[in-house]
């Protein structure tokens, strides 16, 4: 994944010093795009080991419409713990918006269900979009959505996805987001009798935290390795019925993990 290393280097070369909500400080650029051909392998960063278990369980959690960390914790995933309240709740974040978007008239919309229906019945639509940025509920969220909107595109039997991310933690967050939405693209493609085409990542405020500078330097010193392959072992009748054991990543041979503090 040379594209990702180029992204890190671009921030180092062109970024400006900025303050931020966490008080840590960043080097930041505004606007960057990366493209990954999902037919050439699964875009899982190889210059450090990615905790794939967390990627998969978080996506399954989103698809459940869940906003409490209990499901994650029960499966050994703690990536949302810092933001949860004493009851494990996070407010109306991603899962709630994907599956139960509240309308002014009191209705709720299952955006994922509507998306799949539209892909199947109107694949040339330019409205194949899911948004997590519900302005009316932002103040109730433990953390407003960083990856806030994604759009799909169907052509020649392939399904492609473009993710828009307003705030991009380049070292810790972005590799995770690339893997998560690439997996989602594969799942939706299979549910719609399509093949996964391309994943496009588009970032707004793309930043490296000051506390991640050494880790980024270490990662840039490493040579990328061949991408692994995603194997999906089962196709349930519903997008929401996948489980962790339905997925295998083969030929993933990353460099060792690089630890870094999370900016809360």
From Swiss-Prot:
<dbReference type="InterPro" id="IPR036926">
    <property type="entry name" value="Thymidate_synth/dCMP_Mease_sf"/>
</dbReference>
<dbReference type="GO" id="GO:0006231">
    <property type="term" value="P:dTMP biosynthetic process"/>
</dbReference>
<keyword id="KW-0963">Cytoplasm</keyword>
<dbReference type="GO" id="GO:0006235">
    <property type="term" value="P:dTTP biosynthetic process"/>
</dbReference>
<dbReference type="Pfam" id="PF00303">
    <property type="entry name" value="Thymidylat_synt"/>
</dbReference>
<feature type="binding site" description="in other chain">
    <location>
        <position position="21"/>
    </location>
    <ligand>
        <name>dUMP</name>
    </ligand>
</feature>
<dbReference type="InterPro" id="IPR045097">
    <property type="entry name" value="Thymidate_synth/dCMP_Mease"/>
</dbReference>
<feature type="binding site" description="in other chain">
    <location>
        <begin position="166"/>
        <end position="169"/>
    </location>
    <ligand>
        <name>dUMP</name>
    </ligand>
</feature>
<keyword id="KW-0808">Transferase</keyword>
<feature type="binding site">
    <location>
        <begin position="126"/>
        <end position="127"/>
    </location>
    <ligand>
        <name>dUMP</name>
    </ligand>
</feature>
<keyword id="KW-0545">Nucleotide biosynthesis</keyword>
<comment type="pathway">
    <text>Pyrimidine metabolism; dTTP biosynthesis.</text>
</comment>
<feature type="binding site">
    <location>
        <position position="51"/>
    </location>
    <ligand>
        <name>(6R)-5,10-methylene-5,6,7,8-tetrahydrofolate</name>
    </ligand>
</feature>
<feature type="binding site" description="in other chain">
    <location>
        <position position="177"/>
    </location>
    <ligand>
        <name>dUMP</name>
    </ligand>
</feature>
<comment type="function">
    <text>Catalyzes the reductive methylation of 2'-deoxyuridine-5'-monophosphate (dUMP) to 2'-deoxythymidine-5'-monophosphate (dTMP) while utilizing 5,10-methylenetetrahydrofolate (mTHF) as the methyl donor and reductant in the reaction, yielding dihydrofolate (DHF) as a by-product. This enzymatic reaction provides an intracellular de novo source of dTMP, an essential precursor for DNA biosynthesis.</text>
</comment>
<protein>
    <recommendedName>
        <fullName>Thymidylate synthase</fullName>
        <ecNumber>2.1.1.45</ecNumber>
    </recommendedName>
</protein>
<feature type="active site" description="Nucleophile">
    <location>
        <position position="146"/>
    </location>
</feature>
<feature type="binding site">
    <location>
        <position position="263"/>
    </location>
    <ligand>
        <name>(6R)-5,10-methylene-5,6,7,8-tetrahydrofolate</name>
    </ligand>
</feature>
<feature type="binding site">
    <location>
        <position position="169"/>
    </location>
    <ligand>
        <name>(6R)-5,10-methylene-5,6,7,8-tetrahydrofolate</name>
    </ligand>
</feature>
<comment type="subunit">
    <text>Homodimer.</text>
</comment>
<dbReference type="GO" id="GO:0032259">
    <property type="term" value="P:methylation"/>
</dbReference>
<dbReference type="InterPro" id="IPR000398">
    <property type="entry name" value="Thymidylate_synthase"/>
</dbReference>
<dbReference type="InterPro" id="IPR023451">
    <property type="entry name" value="Thymidate_synth/dCMP_Mease_dom"/>
</dbReference>
<dbReference type="InterPro" id="IPR020940">
    <property type="entry name" value="Thymidylate_synthase_AS"/>
</dbReference>
<comment type="similarity">
    <text>Belongs to the thymidylate synthase family. Bacterial-type ThyA subfamily.</text>
</comment>
<keyword id="KW-0489">Methyltransferase</keyword>
<dbReference type="GO" id="GO:0004799">
    <property type="term" value="F:thymidylate synthase activity"/>
</dbReference>
<dbReference type="GO" id="GO:0005829">
    <property type="term" value="C:cytosol"/>
</dbReference>
<feature type="binding site" description="in other chain">
    <location>
        <begin position="207"/>
        <end position="209"/>
    </location>
    <ligand>
        <name>dUMP</name>
    </ligand>
</feature>
